A protein has these predicted regions:
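Start-transfer (signal-anchor) and selected internal transmembrane alpha helices
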Residues: 1-38, 54-131, 312-313
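Hydrophobic alpha-helical membrane-interfacial segments at the cytosolic entry of transmembrane helices
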Residues: 33-37, 101-108, 266-271, 301-330, ...
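Transmembrane-helix motifs of polytopic, lipid-linked glycan transferases
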Residues: 82-87, 192-215, 223
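Hydrophobic, aromatic-rich transmembrane alpha-helices
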Residues: 82-87, 364-393, 400-407, 429-430
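Specific aromatic-rich, kink-prone transmembrane helix
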Residues: 207, 245-263, 426-430
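Membrane-interface alpha helices of multi-pass inner-membrane proteins
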Residues: 229-233, 251-253, 263-290, 319
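Short acidic/glycine- and proline-prone juxtamembrane loop motifs at membrane-interface regions
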Residues: 233-245
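Perimembrane helix-loop-helix junctions
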Residues: 253-265, 282-315, 384-385
Length: 461
């Protein structure tokens, strides 16, 4: 006697993405809108630049400059892309889960390193984080960590003799502490810092699928993994600290999604750390609450179990925050000063009317062309309230809400292709809703996006 998996109220087998017959035209429409948005952002950006408007982005909507080039990483990047497009979807469906995660991580690592090496070993990797604006510039001056933390906010504003450099001033001290810690254990310098960014950043290809699986959607997790491997945003993961930020947040959310309550406190500690790596990650609270709401709960406990998990995670966040407060840094003080510092610089020149929509074009180049159609397929069930508890719907929607809030704030004018990496990876959780038969084509588009950006533009600051 043959048995079949149970069907949901929507009439599909549990654990499988919904059928997508007859919706290819809608995907094509969304793709056309993406292309139009990108074309408009490039054209209007060029026009504004000719008119003398200070965008401070030579290749708007990206913070980059036009410089077609090839490098040592070109051939390896093409080979990795071809292998993942050809074999990725099939392996993702069939491979044992532990081997799939290990293989996915190694492939993401190879992809990110190859893209970085397109710009050369020195400029693309070893010296990428050694410029004056980066954290490493400040590391030699941090001889007393407690004193640095106690006086951190006093050095945020610009035009002081001891003002922090651009990235250090624009983030909580946790970001600088990461690189100070590397230096203290003998891993100082640009090469070790860049390698740390890449090694950590590639873990999103594990954490995001792990979260989806823990929330009961293994099929969605397997579908998303090849897309996370060929993430176009890998151009900026290798190498920028934002790759680490994305990794810490994704790991925290993956732990929060795990069954039971043992992982809730460690999840909160990671989320608290994320909050002290980037002010913008306060918006990840939307994702964290979504994960808690989607967690499977015992019928007898219902929401009581979720409230306990939320309390434990909150305790972890509070513990990290309390440690920073005890050391002399209060997040809200830093945030208010950063807003002031932000408008002491290029943000005062960059026009809000352009960047509020051009940012979305930059996000598309980070998340890839598959993100728009996938998100559109997730928004439909979310609006109709027919998605149930599907994390492949609600997590991308939550990420989109966070991005929208960041965009409207006016505190993200340009450079969002790396700043929004922690949210972009969660948009790709929705790719399970794209027709499986089309996944190779979408993967090819993802890879092509990264390759074109990396070879036409010089993204090194």
């Amino acid at each position: 006697m043959t048995t079949h998996p149970p069907r949901t109220a929507a009439g599909r087998r549990a654990g499988h993405p919904p059928r997508a017959a007859g919706r290819g035209g809608r995907d094509a429409t969304v793709l056309a809108v993406e292309a139009a948005l990108l074309g408009a952002a490039v054209a209007v950006g060029a026009l504004l630049d000719r008119r003398g408007v200070d965008l401070h982005a030579d290749a708007a909507p990206l913070y980059a400059s036009w410089r077609p080039h090839v490098g040592w990483g070109t051939v390896p990047a093409l080979l990795v892309a071809a292998a993942v497009v050809r074999y990725g979807p099939g392996l993702a469906r069939r491979a044992p889960w532990p081997r799939l995660l290990a293989g996915g991580y190694l492939a993401a690592l190879a992809w990110t390193l190859s893209l970085a090496l397109v710009d050369g070993w020195s400029a693309g990797f070893a010296e990428r984080l050694t410029v004056q604006a980066e954290y490493l510039h400040e590391v030699p001056g941090v001889r007393d960590v407690p004193a640095m933390l106690a006086g951190f906010t006093g050095r945020i504003l610009d035009f002081q003799p001891d003002s922090w450099s651009t990235h250090t001033s624009g983030h909580p001290p946790g970001a600088l502490l990461l690189f100070v810690a590397l230096d203290r254990v003998g891993l100082g310098g640009g090469t070790a810092a860049a390698l740390a960014c890449v090694l950590a950043g590639a873990t999103v290809s594990v954490s995001v699928p792990a979260a989806l699986r823990a929330l009961g959607r293994e099929a969605a997790a397997r579908a998303a993994l090849p897309f996370l491997v060929l993430l176009p945003g890998a151009v900026w993961v290798g190498a920028s600290a934002d790759g680490i930020f994305a990794a810490v947040l994704a790991a925290g959310l993956a732990l929060l999604a795990r069954p039971g309550r043992r992982a809730a406190l460690p999840a909160g500690l990671l989320l608290g750390l994320a909050l002290h790596l980037s002010y913008g990650l306060v918006l990840a609270g939307v994702l964290a609450l979504t994960v808690v709401a989607l967690r499977p709960a015992d019928r007898r406990d219902g929401w009581a179990d979720r409230w306990r998990v939320l309390a434990l995670a909150g305790a972890g966040v509070a513990a990290v925050t309390g440690a920073f407060v005890a050391a002399g840094f209060w997040w809200l003080d830093g945030y208010h000063l950063v807003v002031e510092r932000y408008y002491q610089g290029w943000a005062a020149d960059r026009p809000y009317g352009y960047w509020i929509w051009a940012n979305l074009a930059a996000l598309l180049l980070c998340a890839g062309p598959a993100a728009g159609p996938a998100l559109a397929r997730a928004l439909g069930p979310a609006v109709r309230r027919s998605a149930g508890r599907d994390p492949a719907v609600w997590l991308p929607v939550a990420a989109a809400v966070a991005v929208l809030a960041a965009d409207l704030s006016g505190l993200s004018k340009a450079e969002v292709e790396r700043i929004w990496l922690p949210f972009a990876v969660w948009l790709l959780a929705a790719v399970a809703r794209l027709p499986a038969a089309h996944h190779r084509w979408w993967l090819a588009g993802q890879a092509a996006t990264a390759l074109v950006v990396n070879h036409l533009l010089w993204t090194v600051s």
